[in-house]
């Protein structure tokens, strides 16, 4: 069983030291330009999950509350990538999208590379839940600023799966 305090420390350190930091290979942008504000305002909820599908089903019932993002962390050895991915995709299709929610995944077994930069947290299987409509508005704002210009098309196609493509 994962220790919730260790998980929180690890994920917040990853956010502060990578996700929020501008990178030259990403056009000088941070991987997520909104992460720092969410972290500093306390609108990130990090939980140790039990079962990805059912955790997300409960999240769809409860909603986001005051949070911009709800992150469930799992031991990737207990949830291999194929099983984890399918659970998250099923959750999106079966109940999250109709509640204006979207779950994005991060799993150490599925390396996400953008212009030579590894985007993964690397230690945990993560499901990151956000408001779909807010995510679409934010993506459009960033597209208007040129945020996606340096990102590979193949990566963007998968990123905007189940979402409005702002480009």
Task: Locate each region found by the language model.
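Expand to "…catalyze enediolate/carbanion chemistry for C-C bond making/breaking, isomerization
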Residues: 1-167
């Amino acid at each position: 069983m994962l220790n919730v305090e260790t998980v929180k420390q690890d994920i917040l350190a990853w956010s502060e030291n990578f996700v929020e930091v501008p990178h030259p290979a990403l056009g000088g942008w941070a991987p997520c330009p909104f992460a720092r504000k969410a972290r500093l305002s306390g609108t990130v909820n990090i939980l140790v999950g039990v079962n990805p599908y059912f955790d997300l089903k409960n999240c769809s019932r409860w909603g986001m509350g005051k949070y911009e993002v709800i992150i469930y962390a799992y031991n990737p050895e207990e949830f291999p990538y194929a099983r984890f991915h399918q659970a998250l995709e099923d959750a999106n299709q079966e109940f999250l999208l109709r509640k204006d929610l979207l779950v994005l995944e991060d799993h150490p077994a599925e390396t996400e590379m953008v212009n030579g930069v590894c985007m993964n947290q690397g230690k945990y299987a993560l499901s990151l839940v956000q408001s779909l409509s807010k995510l679409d508005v934010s993506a459009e704002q960033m597209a208007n600023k040129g945020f996606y210009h340096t990102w590979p098309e193949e990566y963007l196609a998968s990123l905007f799966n189940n979402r409005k493509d702002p480009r």
